[in-house]
From Swiss-Prot:
Modified residues (Phosphoserine): S695, S729, S735, S983, S1015, S1044
Ranges where the record places region Disordered: 972-998, 1028-1060
Species in which this protein is naturally found: Homo sapiens
Protein name: Phosphorylase b kinase regulatory subunit alpha, liver isoform
Gene field: PHKA2
Listed GO MF terms: calmodulin binding; phosphorylase kinase activity
Pfam family, one: KPBB_C
Amino acid sequence: MRSRSNSGVRLDGYARLVQQTILCYQNPVTGLLSASHEQKDAWVRDNIYSILAVWGLGMAYRKNADRDEDKAKAYELEQNVVKLMRGLLQCMMRQVAKVEKFKHTQSTKDSLHAKYNTATCGTVVGDDQWGHLQVDATSLFLLFLAQMTASGLRIIFTLDEVAFIQNLVFYIEAAYKVADYGMWERGDKTNQGIPELNASSVGMAKAALEAIDELDLFGAHGGRKSVIHVLPDEVEHCQSILFSMLPRASTSKEIDAGLLSIISFPAFAVEDVNLVNVTKNEIISKLQGRYGCCRFLRDGYKTPREDPNRLHYDPAELKLFENIECEWPVFWTYFIIDGVFSGDAVQVQEYREALEGILIRGKNGIRLVPELYAVPPNKVDEEYKNPHTVDRVPMGKVPHLWGQSLYILSSLLAEGFLAAGEIDPLNRRFSTSVKPDVVVQVTVLAENNHIKDLLRKHGVNVQSIADIHPIQVQPGRILSHIYAKLGRNKNMNLSGRPYRHIGVLGTSKLYVIRNQIFTFTPQFTDQHHFYLALDNEMIVEMLRIELAYLCTCWRMTGRPTLTFPISRTMLTNDGSDIHSAVLSTIRKLEDGYFGGARVKLGNLSEFLTTSFYTYLTFLDPDCDEKLFDNASEGTFSPDSDSDLVGYLEDTCNQESQDELDHYINHLLQSTSLRSYLPPLCKNTEDRHVFSAIHSTRDILSVMAKAKGLEVPFVPMTLPTKVLSAHRKSLNLVDSPQPLLEKVPESDFQWPRDDHGDVDCEKLVEQLKDCSNLQDQADILYILYVIKGPSWDTNLSGQHGVTVQNLLGELYGKAGLNQEWGLIRYISGLLRKKVEVLAEACTDLLSHQKQLTVGLPPEPREKIISAPLPPEELTKLIYEASGQDISIAVLTQEIVVYLAMYVRAQPSLFVEMLRLRIGLIIQVMATELARSLNCSGEEASESLMNLSPFDMKNLLHHILSGKEFGVERSVRPIHSSTSSPTISIHEVGHTGVTKTERSGINRLRSEMKQMTRRFSADEQFFSVGQAASSSAHSSKSARSSTPSSPTGTSSSDSGGHHIGWGERQGQWLRRRRLDGAINRVPVGFYQRVWKILQKCHGLSIDGYVLPSSTTREMTPHEIKFAVHVESVLNRVPQPEYRQLLVEAIMVLTLLSDTEMTSIGGIIHVDQIVQMASQLFLQDQVSIGAMDTLEKDQATGICHFFYDSAPSGAYGTMTYLTRAVASYLQELLPNSGCQMQ
């Protein structure tokens, strides 16, 4: 034990240091700290970091106090902390209108300010005069508000302040998709005011959300009304994005020392210890110097070469700051604190000694931490040539309050005055600890007793919804509406949480609302918004994905409880049995494992003691919040209609329902629809009102009327049997079929009025007697085109029965009959949108995957590079899809599937930066045409009629890069649907050898071999000779000639002979797939960066990628990769794009040679053209015809597209010869001669 005198003396010394270097800047009225005596503004982030030393010293005094003076000193210091935190709270509460607006817009103009007036708590600069949007600063405030409250400080006083803090939670919970200016306030490192997604902001928001969740802001004096609620799905979004970004800091910064604050104290936001170590090592190796760490590479702040009269940099100017970036001592304080938390005494000692050596001695010998160390102006060139050799000079603020505070705090920790747990009472430091395996509790509930009896026949005993009363079961969308009430405050005009989708983490908790227990079904089972939940196989697939997600992402005390409802839509078509996919899934759940997840199947009553509970007391009767505060509360837009209610019949008795029950029933009833259309006839084939020929001719005759109306004129028309005679291809694949088949004349006519126009009233009368789904669709489509969606049909004399209502009912019937083409088309007419569309899009963008919708080129192909509001995103998709509304709906579907895969299998997207949805759809249709041996028109029809499960499966095989085949399957006899059934299977050695299954893998292997061979430029040119001479030699076992037009065959290493006919089209298809999904070899962008330093640029399809980009961007920046992609994506043909990538990879081999320059602008197109000509010459020389077919758009031989990368006739051979020939022309003095 240290003696009182020694510890007291040391603490008094720190108290003097705190007073003279930090508290002397504190305003006595507001409690805010000014940045310095010259700069009177108070930065939010700096204020919080600067007060940490005061907070820590107060706790140290309280722990070591055995005199009243020490206790008084501790109280004084703690109140200084409270005063500052409340001062920041007052600054933010004065901008409450911005908090309310930002929740909906996420606009930089609506953000809280980053700095305030120290004396008045007012703003100091305009909304657009500073990079105010800094999510990490607001998150840091919430994080330490939680930590300090948990330590015993009372900072929040009233329920109005509690409501404001709850809305700050909503403010930061979207951090995973908000591009901000980051902790250095500059955004993109060009300092041009461009916001970007920053890992430091995402990580700090994640930590704040986790820390403040379920925290009582009144501390020991509070109740349930002062508890803050956070939805776990928002936290997990941040976690997922953070994992995908690190160690990269942002789009323009490949590494940033600010990441220390999220991988260690104070955030501890990263749960993967390996990722923590990788990020830390990246910072040390790339940013650390003799005086601290530079903030990021090519940081020009306060360097001698920075122009202080200019706010922004020129892009090419960033190269000037290389190797002379200023070094900041503050980052060494992070390493000291990190060493204390991790128990690394060596790290603590090393960095304490290093920091002591660069501190500045002030008056009376006090130690001051300077802001930064800069290179002297007269030694810039010397430092640039020999980094870390020049002695630097201190610049900026002395002391730097942020660094000074962390220096004092680190000293208190290192010397034992504070324990790690005292400044981390919420135990954030254990984030990397091993978590126990999660067991997901699954309860299966039958919608009614009929379904319950059907399950019992199969030996599955479950409860019905009525059996678990008084526990209430509600769909997940009800929980979204309930949470929309959270945080409302009329005094401050706060509306609460915006209505948003709640994920499976949120619906896997049990909720206590007004002393009633509620369980909510996951939203993927909700059929009210989009048609994915109408496919039972898709529901089962989503259940598998969500169970695995729960096992991986559940962090709460207790087990997750997933309620899986079995509704009447999960029965067979005749309703006599349970759908086989659903039944087999229940069997797997009974085994205890499903999709790799540990599960426990049981009744809900068995899980009540082991589940996690959330108490939503903001809906208690004594709260000010009213459920029905306006007439339109809880209503749905027309796109949410359906006749599948499902949950209404088993709720509490009407007489005993309170306001909450009435509110829930109001929400449920708003999505229900009455039935107006006549029931369908089971034998639909014999009950058509119109013949196919008559309907075809007459529907075409009214199309002209659609042009004058404000409705889409859709050349694709309805995907029904009636209209299939004239349906055209979706412009996805080439079709040899004529656009419109000629139909014979007939005397039949649509019912006409006296003016010769279609009599819509008589059409409605015919609709009453129409019992065929296809005919009902035809009639409603004609009414939609002529009269519009809002026209009142007065069907059966009932007022208010609009065309849109009837289409909604038809949508439900089509879902029951699994008519997927019709479902997608009606979804387009009703402008239905996936509820999670914006979220899915954001997931992809946050994983650094840009999106395009529509077919190339621009401007028809729309680029999505930043998150968009749902309405704006839907509008953009429909615009990009042109007049084809089914493609617009399918685009939404594909985006959702891609988001599922990027979360569950991110490895599928390695080296993909831009996902081009239009090309992906095109490739899917092409694959169907190839595999099913049908025309483009038939393939397009088949694609639109695929079930969601089959569509997702087809997409997965395309993304996986594996060879696969598609076959037609026999549909069960009892099925009434006309949609085609296909089966997708991987292709083994039939048609492709194992070593050649993935073209890009073979290309990578070839690159490695050639890299070893091309150690010098002379060696490189000699390969051109060798390749030329070997073209006529006998083929080895690794030779591949799928392109051979002479009919010769090759054999694999196993001796199995594969005919050219069997393998024809294999590599063309492989290149088309890789080009469509923009897949490139690993390390491709870094190699392009290197080759650009040896030439003036690369010309691709008429567009130049200049070498000047390397002066702005570093090789590992996402920003550079996106720039390269933007040039490559100018090429509309995916297979040609992939050949260009292969040619560039050959070129980049020169970056490893001793050649200092390879000329001016290199035209990659010419190299590919030369390679194709060399290929043609060799083919002719071995007996092929000299009129081999060429691609009209590019002039490349079709057989060259279809050549494997390797082998004597492989594309690599010819591209290598072409590069050698091309560079020989550019470099005539190289001393190499081609023969």
